[in-house]
Curated annotation (Swiss-Prot):
Tissues of expression: Expressed in all tissues examined. Highest levels are in the spleen, thymus, peripheral blood and heart. Lowest in the kidney and pancreas.
Highest taxon in the source lineage: Eukaryota
InterPro entries according to UniProt: Headcase, Headcase_mid, HECA_N
Function field: May play an important role in some human cancers. May be part of the regulatory mechanism in the development of epithelial tube networks such as the circulatory system and lungs.
Keyword Plastid tagged: no
Residues where Phosphoserine is found: S264, S268
GO terms, biological process: negative regulation of mitotic cell cycle; respiratory tube development
One Pfam family in the UniProt entry: HECA_N
Annotated region described as Disordered, given as residue ranges: 1-26, 197-283
Name of the protein in its database record: Headcase protein homolog
Species classification: Eukaryota, Metazoa, Chordata, Craniata, Vertebrata
Length: 543
């Protein structure tokens, strides 16, 4: 007959030191206690009969119940943590050193992102970029290649091919600072191949499961069904990425091959397009231009009903912005339209003369159609109209006063001037992207009233007045004209740390240099530091 004291002594002999070994895993301790109680209850039942068994059963049941409750709580907490971790894995912050074009995390379930790596082992930043953010960052690095001696002999295609190789990255790493401030980013060239192999493996296993055949038979059947001269297609998961990359390359080859020589009053050097330059533009750009009155133009050019039907049917495309304002002049990018974008034909310059003095009506102050036939004006006109047609727009808004400016099909193209900015400005709802020498730029405009001083434009920092009267009307500048003439030190400060990038008393040599990527000497961030938001100017009053 076993001695009950021995079983109690066995309990006392159990290790329970002051370091809390039993308390490290609460659920495990409760489960162990329940098991010990059940064993002790069984021993007492065998020794003392039914009474002892009846007395031991409640103790064993209570201990076992406590252990089960603790284990259930632990399992529930673990499941909740796993679910939260799963949701967090589907998104990651964008790792671009520049400003994120989307302002939201990267959705890892989609196929529009790129992986990058930082050479800092303890980098806390993300390793994922939106595909568009990666292209913008890559284009900003390409701009800096023009300043490097060994890379000056490379063309754009060679720069893109060599950038992430060893010889190219040895030159480019200085422009690839990571947000952590202690490392440099680099494109993960192995990631896409690994992902592609995984997608192919998943597709192959999925097709074998669907057919219900052994893997060998399925592979042989696929080979038999495949045409002999037709190349093998890639996996369907790679199609969106391939389409986006092909579209990016085609746009850069067709549209971004040249920077046009729009005359800058400060002597900024113009650049001419290369020989054999071709532009992607609608056929009616080069054909005969028929006369069209304003009423007929508005009736044919406004496509409000297709927009409303598309919105009601849920056909909302990515990066699409719709404007149903009373003006109703804008034809936005909202899908595939059969009707080409139509631009207004300027009958005379009487409307422009109401905003400028008569002595300024000459080819120096206003870009004329006759002047365009002499130089590169025809290519410039096609470039602008092609970019607007691709975005389905025939009206632009002033960046300062937001006045609607119809675009004409002849010079002067607008009652104001157009310019390209490397940054996407949120103050303007629509976006007209275009590629210029491999750089992604955005087309904006300033109206003639803001340029000529009819509207008083002041800087919100120093309260000084902005003067745009020296700009040529009706043409396009290949840089941000609002950033080209900084009035105070605040316009030359870093966008991240707020410290001065350069001294305002020194400035830059050319107007276009203010629209280039600069590196802050204090925090090391690469950005378009001098391209400030349009809201940094204020329309104080209109005379």
């Amino acid at each position: 007959m076993p001695n009950p004291k021995n079983s109690k002594g066995g309990r006392k002999n159990k290790r329970a030191n002051s370091s809390g070994d039993e308390q490290e895993n609460g659920a495990g301790a409760l489960a162990a206690a329940g098991a010990a109680g059940a064993a002790a209850g069984g021993a007492l039942a065998a020794a003392a009969g039914c009474g002892a068994a009846a007395a031991g059963a409640p103790g064993a049941g209570g201990a076992a119940g406590a252990g089960g409750a603790g284990t259930g709580a632990a399992n529930a907490a673990a499941a909740a943590g796993a679910a939260a971790a799963g949701d967090a894995k589907n998104e990651a912050p964008c790792a671009t050193p520049l400003i994120c074009s989307f302002g939201r995390p990267v959705d890892l379930e989609k196929d529009d992102y790129q992986k990058v790596v930082c050479n800092n082992e303890h980098c806390p930043c993300s390793t994922w970029m939106h595909l568009q953010c990666f292209y913008e960052w890559e284009s900003s690095i390409l701009v800096q290649f023009n300043c490097i001696g060994r890379a000056r002999s490379w063309n754009e295609k060679q720069c893109r091919q060599n950038m992430w190789t060893k010889k190219g990255y040895d030159l480019a790493f200085r422009f690839c600072s990571c947000r952590c401030g202690q490392g440099h980013l680099k494109k993960d060239t192995d990631w896409y191949q690994v992902k592609r192999m995984q997608d192919e493996k998943k597709k192959k296993s999925g097709s074998e499961k669907n057919t219900g055949r052994p893997p060998g038979e399925a592979a042989e059947e696929a080979k038999k069904c495949r045409p002999p001269n037709k190349p093998q297609k890639g996996p369907s998961h790679d199609l969106p990425r391939r389409h986006s990359m092909d579209r990016q390359n085609s746009q850069e080859k067709a549209v971004g091959a040249a920077a046009y020589g729009a005359r800058s009053p400060g002597g900024s050097p113009g650049q001419s397009p290369p020989t054999g330059y071709s532009i992607l533009s609608p056929a009616h750009f080069s054909g005969p231009r028929s006369s069209r009155y304003l009423g007929e133009f508005l009736k044919n050019a406004i496509h409000l009903e297709p927009h409303k039907k598309a919105m009601a049917g849920g056909h909302v495309f990515r990066n699409a912005h719709f404007d149903y304002s009373p003006a109703g002049l804008a034809v936005h990018r909202g899908g595939h339209f059969d009707t080409p974008v139509q631009f207004l034909r300027r009958l005379d310059l009487s409307e422009l003369l109401t905003h400028i003095p008569r002595h300024k009506l000459n080819t120096f102050h206003v870009r004329m159609e006759d002047d365009a036939q002499v130089g590169q004006g025809e290519d410039l006109r096609k470039f602008i109209l092609a970019a607007l047609s691709a975005s389905h727009r025939n009206v632009v808004n002033c960046a300062l006063c937001h006045r609607a400016l119809p675009v004409f099909e002849q010079f002067p193209l607008v009652d104001g001037t157009l310019f390209l900015s490397p940054s996407r400005h949120d103050e303007i709802e629509y976006d007209v992207p275009c590629h210029l020498q491999g750089r992604l730029m955005h087309l904006y405009a300033v109206c003639v009233d803001c340029l000529e001083g009819v509207h008083k434009i002041i800087c919100i920092k120093c309260k000084s007045r902005w003067d745009g009267s020296w700009h040529q009307l009706g043409t396009m500048y290949t840089y941000d004209i609002l950033a080209a003439s900084p009035c105070c030190q605040a316009r030359l400060n870093c966008k991240h740390c707020g410290k001065p990038v350069i001294d305002v008393r020194i400035g830059m040599q050319y107007f276009s240099e203010y629209s280039n990527v600069q590196q802050c000497p204090h925090c090391g961030n690469l950005d378009y530091h001098f391209v400030k938001p349009f809201s940094s100017f204020k329309v104080l009053e209109a005379y």
